[in-house]
């Protein structure tokens, strides 16, 4: 109960007065408007069905073909909306855990334990990512309502192929409603949470700036290579799971994400006993 009380307090304080959320809303709206332009310019992409909410999710989380497979590196391009969203997802929970340790470290040692502090920060990181993802879902939902698009998680294989210039879809997964929920909601969220947990560990034990730079490096490397250890691949699920032949399967991706989250959490529990939580900022001394 002590851990959950701390986590609840952390989430409230971590969300309060964050100017990043208006920026996140703007980036989500840019993605939706880009999709709206696609609807107007290429209705043939949607086959016989009307554009749906699933199509909008697919457009935002599609990713691009791994650059290492391109004939020339001059074609190196990072999907701008995807990159901005990922940078904001990773930035949202980054600073608060360190600030809480700097400002209230002594109070944690007096009133609770290091282990409770770490567990609360893990729950905080997961909670912030879920809240931010729900915000994105709400924005896309409202966009679909305004555009009078079906609120459906159903689309077809031809749409996925069209996003990649006619490349075939290499997957035995039936692209059903539940298949799309896995591809477009569950897996991207798990990928974001796994990256944020890894970032939390590096931020607490090394430095938050180094942690964020490492996250940016993972994002860039994920555009180059389709490897499960590069966690950002799991947020480009159509590319990784459907378009790349011998790509990352849905089950494999879920196991990687959950495995990294569990590993980071357990390592934190083991190492936090020796963590100095009485660090003060220079201006506080």
Listing of model-derived features with the role each one plays in the protein:
Residues 1-24:
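Aromatic- and glycine-rich beta-strand/loop motifs that create alpha-glucan
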Residues 3-8, 115, 119, 178-182:
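Alpha-helical membrane-protein architecture signal
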Residues 27-42, 222-228:
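Alpha-helical transmembrane segments of multi-pass membrane proteins
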Residues 23-26, 192-196, 241-285:
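Alpha-helical transmembrane segments of multi-pass membrane transporters/translocases
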Residues 24-28, 207-223, 282-284:
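Central hydrophobic cores of alpha-helical transmembrane segments
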Residues 15, 201-209, 273-278:
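Membrane-interface helix-boundary motifs at transmembrane edges
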Residues 32-95, 122-200, 204, 239-257:
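Secretory targeting signals
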Residues 94-128:
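Helix-loop-helix units of permease transmembrane domains in multi-pass membrane transporters
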């Amino acid at each position: 109960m002590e851990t959950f009380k701390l986590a609840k307090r952390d989430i409230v304080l971590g969300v309060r007065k964050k100017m990043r959320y208006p920026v996140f809303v703007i980036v989500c709206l840019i993605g939706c408007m880009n999709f709206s332009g696609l609807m107007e310019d290429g209705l043939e992409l949607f086959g016989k069905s009307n554009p749906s909410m699933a199509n909008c999710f697919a457009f935002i989380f599609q990713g691009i073909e791994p650059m290492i497979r391109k004939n020339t590196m001059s074609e190196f391009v990072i999907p701008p909306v995807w990159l901005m969203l990922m940078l904001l997802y990773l930035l949202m929970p980054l600073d608060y855990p360190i600030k809480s340790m700097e400002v209230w470290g002594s109070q944690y040692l007096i009133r609770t334990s290091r282990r409770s502090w770490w567990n609360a920060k893990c729950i905080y990181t997961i909670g912030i990512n879920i809240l931010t993802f729900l915000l994105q879902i709400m924005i896309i939902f409202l966009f679909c309502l305004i555009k009078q698009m079906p609120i459906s998680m159903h689309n077809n294989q031809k749409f996925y192929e069209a996003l990649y210039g006619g490349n075939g879809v290499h997957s035995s997964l039936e692209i059903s409603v539940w298949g799309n929920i896995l591809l477009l909601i569950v897996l991207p969220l798990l990928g974001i949470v796994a990256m944020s947990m890894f970032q939390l560990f590096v931020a607490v034990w090394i430095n938050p700036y180094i942690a964020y730079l490492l996250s940016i490096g993972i994002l860039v490397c994920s555009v180059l290579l389709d490897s499960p250890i590069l966690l950002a691949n799991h947020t480009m699920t159509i590319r990784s799971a459907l378009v790349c032949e011998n790509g990352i399967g849905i089950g494999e991706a879920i196991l990687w994400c959950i495995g990294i989250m569990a590993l980071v959490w357990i390592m934190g529990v083991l190492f936090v006993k020796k963590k100095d939580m009485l660090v003060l900022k220079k201006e506080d001394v």
